[in-house]
């Protein structure tokens, strides 16, 4: 939401049709199984039409060193030809290969301003990436949107 608020961009959440249920530990175990299997869950339709956009910032949390399965589904079922994708991810200190994996799945996209945003490795909400770095990145995105 910070990115949308600072850029004035629209926001659309990529959500699974079937929400994750259970304790944090159960959801983590399920997530690991899904990532290891390359599972692509059904996702809900977006609240926006991708055809209306030339620049898309697509973000994901890190799930076992790659993107969340819902984001994998989204990137797999859409064609990004002629669009600029700004891939970004959050992590707790282990970025893995998320950005590379996202780029590999974005068919036809050009890429700009990728970003890794790190939080506390102990599972807390403390931001480790400096706010100055994030502010600079948001400035780059604003310029990309206004080209």
Model segments located where?
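N-terminal beta1-alpha1-beta2 submodule of the flavodoxin-like/Rossmannoid cofactor-binding fold
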Residues: 1-58, 65-67, 72, 76, ...
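A structural micro-motif
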Residues: 7-9, 83, 109
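Short, conserved loop/helix-junction motifs that constitute active-site signature segments
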Residues: 50, 76-82, 105-107
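Surface-exposed loop/turn positions
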Residues: 54, 83-84
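Redox-cofactor binding/interface segments in oxidoreductases and associated redox assembly factors
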Residues: 58-59, 87
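Gly/Ser/Thr-rich loops at beta-strand to alpha-helix junctions
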Residues: 61-65, 91-94
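Short, glycine-/small-residue-rich phosphate/pyrophosphate-handling segment
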Residues: 86-128
């Amino acid at each position: 939401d910070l990115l949308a608020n600072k850029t004035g961009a629209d926001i659309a959440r990529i959500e699974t049709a079937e929400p994750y249920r259970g304790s944090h530990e159960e959801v983590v175990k399920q997530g690991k199984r899904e990532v290891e299997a390359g599972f692509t869950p059904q996702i809900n339709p977006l609240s926006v039409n991708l055809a209306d956009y030339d620049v898309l910032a697509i973000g994901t949390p890190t799930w076992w060193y790659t993107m969340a399965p819902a984001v994998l589904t989204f990137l797999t079922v859409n064609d990004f030809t002629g669009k600029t994708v700004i891939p970004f991810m959050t992590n707790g200190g282990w970025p893995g290969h998320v950005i590379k994996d996202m780029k590999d799945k974005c068919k036809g996209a050009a890429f700009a301003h990728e970003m890794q945003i790190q939080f506390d490795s102990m599972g807390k909400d403390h931001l480790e990436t400096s706010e100055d770095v994030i502010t600079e990145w948001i400035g780059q995105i604003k310029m990309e949107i206004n080209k």
